[in-house]
């Protein structure tokens, strides 16, 4: 967000502008963590630590019921929501309750769980490794699919007493599901339905800024970004979110930053909540994860991380080159939504993905949707969530 630095300095140096103070309103949620935000809207919550097989500790949040529901009821069907790249569980609760999927599901009578990927703001602990060490950050979406997703699903089912759950993934949250559900048959049996929002398998045609990483060598990327964390939320970005982007004067500038990452759809963004949207973004990931995405852009395949030389690949995969994941092996019933203005999950990549989904039960392309509309869009309840909840209800009746 360096482009905002000059703007901020100009604002601070120039002093008051006509109407400037009157337009400065910060939403209280912009300074809240996940548990505080859930409580703020009157919902109950639980915080659980998922411990993966390789020692990562993942912060997982539960909304066991809606505002008007009693805790003392029969076991509820479980819905597990998993965010995308450099994001967090905050995505599912950052809008008003009538526009946030997690709250809508809770009010519809479901037991809602919000996952956080390793290395983000809420999942930055380990049984043995320090986040200050490069060893902690030696992961990508391979490990999220192999370790994070199974561990989280198993804990959720254990705590809820259920045998299956409904899985909702956005962006990278769909990527790790495609991998996990196609390579781990026992895990796949525990998924009743898979809802894929802005699904990402290949990124051959992506137009997102991450494509710029492909112009750099691995060595250059590590010189620029190091070998640990990539793009975490800083005090400066929090300042921009709560002191600049909360002002109507800068709504267009701040929203254009979001659109540059996701695609253009200004009519569908609640500008009055820009400070909330930006206050916990980005939530961070590993440099290795970003290198893996750059590899995916170059290869045009959904492939395991290339460790850089045949010996390393042989050690990890028992073959000289990283294996390609075969999504067609996934048998989980799957519903998908894609966006016509999505610069991350490009329409051509989605078109190539569709025939590989062996049990596709529903697909909808929304022409005006960008990558973030699936959790930020003001019309998401009408375009996506209504049908998603209906499919859950129909599945439970069968």
UniProtKB/Swiss-Prot annotation:
Residues 1-19 form the signal peptide. Its EC number is 3.1.1.-. The active site is at 171 (nucleophile), 342 (charge relay system), 371 (charge relay system). It is an enzyme of class 3 (hydrolase). GO terms for molecular function: hydrolase activity, acting on ester bonds. Residues 78-377 form the AB hydrolase-1 domain. Glycans are attached at residues 270, 326. Its main location: secreted. Keywords: Disulfide bond, Glycoprotein, Hydrolase, Lipid degradation, Lipid metabolism, Secreted, Signal. It is found in: Secreted. Disulfide bonds join 245-254. It comes from the Eukaryota. GO terms for biological process: lipid catabolic process. GO terms for cellular component: extracellular region. The keyword Manganese does not apply. InterPro entries: AB_hydrolase_1, AB_hydrolase_fold, Lipase_euk. The keyword Transferase does not apply. Belongs to the AB hydrolase superfamily. Lipase family. Plays a highly specific role in the last step of keratinocyte differentiation. May have an essential function in lipid metabolism of the most differentiated epidermal layers. This is Lipase member K.
């Amino acid at each position: 967000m360096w482009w905002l630095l000059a703007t901020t300095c100009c604002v601070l140096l120039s002093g008051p502008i006509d109407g400037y103070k009157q337009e400065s309103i910060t939403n209280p949620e912009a300074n809240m963590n996940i548990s505080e935000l859930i409580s703020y809207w009157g919902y109950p919550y639980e915080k659980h630590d998922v411990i993966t097989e390789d020692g990562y500790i993942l912060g997982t949040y539960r909304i066991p019921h809606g505002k008007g529901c009693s805790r003392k009821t029969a076991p509820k069907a479980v819905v597990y929501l998993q965010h995308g790249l450099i994001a967090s569980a905050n995505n599912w609760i950052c809008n008003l309750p009538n526009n946030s999927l997690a709250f809508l599901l809770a009010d519809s009578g479901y037991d809602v769980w919000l996952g956080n990927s390793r290395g983000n703001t809420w999942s930055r602990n380990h049984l043995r490794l320090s986040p200050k060490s490069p060893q902690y950050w030696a992961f990508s979406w391979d490990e999220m699919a192999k370790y994070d997703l199974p561990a989280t699903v198993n804990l959720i089912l254990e705590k809820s007493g259920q045998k299956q759950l409904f899985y909702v993934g956005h962006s990278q949250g769909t990527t790790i599901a495609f991998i996990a559900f196609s390579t781990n048959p026992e895990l796949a049996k525990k998924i009743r339905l898979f809802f894929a929002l802005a699904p990402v398998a290949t990124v051959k045609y992506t137009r997102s800024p991450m494509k710029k990483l492909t112009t750099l060598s691995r060595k250059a990327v590590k010189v620029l970004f190091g070998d640990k964390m990539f793009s975490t939320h800083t005090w400066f970005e929090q300042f921009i979110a709560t002191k600049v982007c909360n002002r109507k004067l800068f709504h267009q500038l701040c929203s254009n930053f979001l659109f540059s990452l996701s695609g253009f759809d200004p009519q569908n963004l609640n500008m009055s909540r820009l400070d909330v949207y930006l206050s916990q973004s980005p939530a961070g990931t590993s440099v290795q994860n970003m290198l893996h995405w750059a590899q995916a852009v170059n290869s045009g395949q959904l492939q395991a991380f290339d460790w850089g030389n045949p010996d390393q690949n042989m050690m990890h995969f028992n073959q000289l080159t990283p294996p390609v994941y075969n999504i067609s092996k996934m048998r989980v019933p799957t519903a998908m939504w894609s966006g016509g203005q999505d610069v991350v999950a490009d329409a051509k990549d989605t078109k190539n993905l569709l025939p590989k989904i062996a049990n596709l039960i529903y697909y909808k392309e929304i022409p005006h949707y960008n990558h973030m509309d699936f959790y930020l869009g003001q019309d998401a309840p009408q375009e996506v969530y209504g049908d998603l909840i209906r499919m859950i209800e129909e599945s439970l009746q069968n």
